[in-house]
Amino acid sequence: TSGTGIINHTFKEYKPCVININRNRKNGALISMSQGKAIPYALFNLQERGKLIIPSNIEVYEGMIIGFNSRENDLTVNPLKTKQLTNFRSSGADEAIVLTPETKITLEKAIEMINEDELIEVTPKEIRLRKRYLKEHERKKDQRSKN
């Protein structure tokens, strides 16, 4: 613009949103059962269960959704599981693990994906999904009270 710019703006009115967002996805969630760093070895084995939404070596906590199950039910998983080393296996053999790229979650995608028992955490660096009740026994208790 070389220092000169013209901006036009047109506004008619505010209206309530009339679009009904269907928030119920058919697949369940993969939920972390413990707190710590997600290990690539564990995530490699969890890839078969569904789509992951977190990269490896990221901090996770109990109740955090780390992926979406390929089936309808929620599944509590351990993303911190490490490979058992024996005298025959060396720790350098971990380098052969290749993870599929995680699904990036935007705020819009997160709003579309959440179920009634889930929440969205928005921080300056990340957007995370989590269960309303972080402890597994609290989630089961809530599920029983609904039925």
Residue ranges of each PLM-predicted region?
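Accessory interaction regions appended to the cores of large information-processing enzymes
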Residues: 1-147
